[in-house]
Amino acid sequence: MNSKERIAKALSISTDTKVFEMGQGVSGRTPEIFNECFPGRKAVILADVHTWPVLGERLCSLFKEAGIETDSYVIDKEVFHAEWKYVEMTDLVVEGDYVAAKVIEDSPEHVETEPEKLFRVPSSAYGVLVSVGSGVINDLCKLASYHHGQSYISVATAASVDGYSSFGASITYGGAKQTFTCPAPVAIVADIDIIASAPKHMTAAGYADLAAKIPAGAEWMIADFTGSEPIHDDAWHILQDYLDDFLADPDGVAAGESQAIADLFEGLTLSGFAMQAARSSRPASCCDHLFSHIMDMTEHRFNGELQSHGYQVAIGTLTMCAVFDELFKQDLTLLDVDACVEAWPTLEQEQSRGLEIFRDFPAPKLGYDEITKKYGDRDAVRAELTRLKAEWPELKSRLQGQMYSFTKMQDLFRRAGAPYDPAHIGLTRSQLKDMLPFVQMMRFRYNVLDLAKRGCFYDKVVEPIFAKGGAWEI
């Protein structure tokens, strides 16, 4: 199946996106696409100080030449992140109140408005957003458009994330990184000439974000096995069937070669379409992304700089590859189910553990809340482990067919220019190890560490990673 056929198939299962235009020079078609999707509407181009000169200013001129009434708003920040105040800022941009939007943008101590209070009637929308940028700007436009009961167009400037086409926006609210429900854009425009010229570190981040779908897929297989989150066939096949091919040219990605960049961007976009089909981020992330959430929520910095999503995910992905390497060394046909069930804590004990682990975290109740959602009683654990013991050889074989080894993934990241050691983003290996209890508990989503806790082999798959000769030897 070629790219055009894959994209057509993906659009057929997409619930929100109807147009995906990718190729060299296609940004010039954006006004035409806008008119097809939003006839007679006003366009409001949202860019930042980096993407405005790269493409935003030219698009603004093209829209006006096409007879489309057009405004623009440029976020005057060298660095900014997907924080709630910028959602509120973008809400005001949709309504044409640029003065109030600028006040929020420049406010050092903005008081966050409760999410449910930001929904507006569609008639309050002044125009339709055209997002010109990468992950953060796209997520801001996605959620603000949803607040106003309308869609938007996303014009990508880098192959840095899978969020362009994903269902939901990842935003920090109340100190916690959360995924807010909102539809993906109705149209995505990806000009490979623009995207291939993006800073190399952004492209490397996108490569790591796409590679994270390898361990995320394996963890979804485990969740499917336990019955907690069954695999959605369309969402699985539209991405996983081609993932190896999309990751096959890390050298071309590093060199900015057009075909390698096009393959990378297509893979990232299909990942988003998978999330649309599943109405969940399950097809694209699991523990690998939770390391990134921890770093975001604790404002981890390296040389004074917050690290990109993809860079953080790179280290989470490598760590989970190492966990699976250790998992495959276990003979779970020898599991003592009775002993594991006897050792399994009560809900109250797990809630207490969650409160203790997250005691000094920016969201201290997060572990308590999430472990409560996914806790299984002893009967459930017995049934799960009994099946695991009986079917481990088959499950192990399927997981091995999905996974990359730590060594293979590290080599791919090295060649693509992505971080391949925690030190590359300013983390010590001890700090990374300390994150694992948080990762296991901080999301209701069933993960491989949950399986290890229930089967009493958590230490066997974690400790060797940080021991002498381990992947992250301390």
Where are the regions a protein language model picked out?
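A glycine/threonine-rich phosphate-anchoring loop and its flanking beta-alpha core
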Residues: 143-245
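Short Gly/Thr/Asp-enriched flexible loops that form oxyanion-binding sites at enzyme active sites
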Residues: 59, 137-150, 295
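C-terminal charged capping/lid subdomain of soluble metabolic enzymes
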Residues: 2-7, 330-474
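Short glycine/serine/threonine-rich phosphate/pyrophosphate-binding segments
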Residues: 54-55, 134-143, 161-164
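A conserved active-site cap/scaffold subdomain adjacent to cofactor or substrate pockets
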Residues: 240-330
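Solvent-exposed alpha-helices and their adjacent loops that cap or buttress functional pockets
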Residues: 12-13, 37-38, 119-124, 145, ...
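ATP/NTP phosphate-donor binding region
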Residues: 1-128
